Amino acid sequence: MNASGNDTPQRIESLSNPLVKELRALRSHKGRIEQRRFLAEGERSLAEAAAARWRAELLLVAPGAAHGVVPADRTIDVTIEVLEKITGRDNPQPHLGVFAEPDASARNLGALNARGAARWLMIEAPRDPGNLGSCIRSADATAAGGVILVGDACDAYSIECVRATMGSIFAVPIYHATRDEAVTLLARWPGESVATAADGSVDYAEIGFTAPTMLVIGTEAEGLSSVLRGACTRVARLPMLGRAESVNLAVAAGIFLYAAERAQR
């Protein structure tokens, strides 16, 4: 229902409308921190939000696009130019949702139920939002309990990361931890904790992945810190059969998640 008290969508055509500036700020980390909101583009991602019982604060709809792709407090018809201005894309998706970020208190490690899922993913200091988004998508595909971001991580709710998740951001809980908090979690983890490293002592295919398994991965450039590596019960490697020395973060995460899923069937 709009400010007039009816269900007719509002319309915004002017690029100087204050709401355009307000939503454009959500492209920056500072803007998301201040507003505690994030953007999600496209009918597919918004359908995933609806399936996961999320409700948008705002739904912006381009001319000719369907309304009602996700439950929303307000629906606003906008021009393609307005969507371009907000998203920074030349060919934006015709749907743009604005969502409140999850309550931080519900996503701290104290709220994590280790036995609530057979596998979990911990990533230390991921920097690339596209890679992180792909990891979140793989976590969703393998029914992981959640993704724990350790240390100086990129923002999981940036428009680039949300885009890369293809809607999985709405299905996978995201937790944040300091390195010390992560070490404490691993020390009391009730199942197996498996670190990944090029010089791991065992091939990943030889691991039983006792549930609940925590998979612990570092970045391709820096690898996993010795502190987190030392806190894990196993250190596994992926065989490099060609000239490549490593695979990127998202590929490694996908391989290990599916290896754990297969072992735990």
PLM features: what roles do these ranges have?
Residues 97, 138-142, 153-169, 226-265:
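Structured adenosyl-cofactor binding patch, chiefly the S-adenosyl-L-methionine
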Residues 42, 127-135, 246-252:
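Amphipathic alpha-helical repeat scaffolds
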